[in-house]
């Protein structure tokens, strides 16, 4: 087996234990695995941001000021997000390979830890909804990375009639532009989510606007609660 990131051969240490016990298949070598920055320690109880990365003046107890502003200034209900990795330079490079270079096989690297994170925080959700790409973006890429991540979870993935209008890439916009922009998401169909706890799945949580734009539509259609599971927290 070769590492999906660097293509180096992955060797296994042979012992009596490995002779009798089936090893889990590895998709990444030890050297590349060290590049993955897992979120550990204290986090914002809402958005999951590592609190050690937040200056003291930008947090109030165990909540960051971004989440407080979303509730107090923007009027959005509190929303729980949990992420697996810090969106640092190493993860940016890996996600670029995953998303923009069309390497969908990289989802295998994240399958088990992403699934474990789900089971830790969201075992009681009703359904998972991946964030859609616009038709143009999905055609360019050949797949939707959020759908691949959602397929890792032991829960029904609901591919709804939720659609996304083609807009400028979020990564090219400043925070203020993202928050003040028009909601690009809409439902084509008549799906309802009466009293359901809906989990939105995406690759990166940065400002939180995407999940709240979709969340507002879900609440309008009867959802009891909306949460979010993402691969990385920016």
At which residue positions do the language-model features occur?
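Glycine-rich phosphate/pyrophosphate-handling loop used in enzymes and phosphotransfer proteins
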Residues: 1-234
């Amino acid at each position: 087996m070769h590492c999906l990131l660097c293509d180096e051969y992955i060797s296994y240490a042979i012992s009596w234990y490995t002779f009798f016990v089936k090893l889990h298949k590895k998709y990444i070598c030890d050297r590349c695995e060290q590049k993955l920055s897992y979120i550990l320690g204290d986090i914002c109880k809402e958005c999951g941001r590592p609190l050690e990365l937040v200056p003291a003046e930008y947090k109030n107890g165990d909540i960051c000021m971004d989440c407080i502003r979303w509730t107090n200034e923007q009027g959005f209900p509190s929303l729980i997000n949990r992420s697996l990795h810090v969106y640092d330079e190493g993860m940016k490079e890996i996600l670029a390979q995953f998303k923009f270079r069309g390497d969908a096989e990289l989802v295998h690297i994240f399958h088990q830890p992403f699934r474990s994170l789900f089971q830790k925080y969201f075992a009681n959700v009703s359904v998972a909804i991946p964030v859609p790409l616009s038709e143009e973006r999905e055609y360019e890429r050949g797949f939707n990375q959020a759908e691949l991540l959602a397929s890792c979870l032991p829960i029904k993935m609901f591919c709804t009639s939720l659609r996304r209008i083609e807009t400028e890439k979020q990564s090219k916009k400043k925070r203020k532009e993202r928050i003040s922009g028009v909601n690009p998401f809409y439902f084509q169909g008549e799906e309802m989510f009466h009293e359901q706890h809906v989990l939105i799945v995406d690759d990166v949580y940065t400002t939180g606007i995407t999940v709240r734009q979709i969340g507002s539509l879900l609440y309008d259609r009867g959802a009891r609660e909306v949460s979010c599971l993402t691969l990385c927290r920016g």
